[in-house]
């Protein structure tokens, strides 16, 4: 008879412990009802990227001295720099500069080590295309600055949403 009573007591303790754990989980679930939603509706709402975000590379043709430091520090030797040596002034003249963003790993080494700061990272991250050859940007495409998320009137950022203004 005694083992049967201790078995029921053990069962009762386990039941109470399980009910306590379920109650704790339910309290955590209820605490999330007071929070704002984290999900954003992507094409219509966009998150503001951080200051150190590494997006598409912006290239300034006039500042480049064709030193090819960006090619040497790139882990995959990605930037293609075509130049011609001007014999009369003994300087390199940049002819073409291109980066294939289908291959780029966005490590930021080219921007970090560029001696003339002709390369910089932008906040653009939308590269979706149907043809991978469209991801090969030349110096003209790299020179265009993308529209900032904050300046785009068609996009509602998370900070401008009506939920954050009301609450």
UniProtKB/Swiss-Prot annotation:
Gene symbol? ndhI
State the UniProt keywords alphabetically. Answer: 4Fe-4S, Chloroplast, Iron, Iron-sulfur, Membrane, Metal-binding, NAD, NADP, Plastid, Plastoquinone, Quinone, Repeat, Thylakoid, Translocase
Q: Which cofactor does it need?
A: [4Fe-4S] cluster
Localization annotation: Plastid, Chloroplast thylakoid membrane
What EC number(s) does the entry state?
7.1.1.-
For membrane topology, the record states: Peripheral membrane protein
Family named by the database record? Belongs to the complex I 23 kDa subunit family.
Q: What is the name of this protein?
A: NAD(P)H-quinone oxidoreductase subunit I, chloroplastic
The taxonomy runs: Eukaryota, Viridiplantae, Streptophyta, Embryophyta, Tracheophyta
Q: What is its main location?
A: plastid
On whether rRNA-binding is a keyword of this UniProt record, the answer is no
């Amino acid at each position: 008879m005694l083992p049967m009573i201790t078995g029921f007591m053990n069962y009762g303790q386990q039941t109470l412990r399980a009910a306590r754990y379920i109650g704790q989980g339910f309290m955590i679930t209820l605490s999330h009802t007071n929070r704002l939603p984290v999900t954003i509706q992507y094409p219509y709402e966009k998150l503001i990227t951080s200051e150190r975000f590494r997006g598409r590379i912006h290239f300034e043709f006039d500042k480049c001295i064709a030193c090819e430091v960006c090619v040497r520090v790139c882990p995959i030797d990605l930037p293609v720099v075509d130049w011609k040596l001007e014999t009369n002034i003994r300087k390199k003249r940049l002819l073409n500069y291109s980066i294939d963003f289908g291959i780029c790993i966005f490590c930021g080494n080219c921007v970090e080590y560029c001696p003339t700061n002709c390369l910089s990272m932008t906040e653009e991250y939308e590269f979706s295309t149907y043809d991978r050859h469209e991801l090969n940007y030349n110096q003209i495409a790299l020179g265009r600055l993308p529209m900032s998320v904050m300046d785009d009137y068609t996009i509602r950022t998370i900070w401008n949403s009506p939920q954050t203004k009301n609450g």
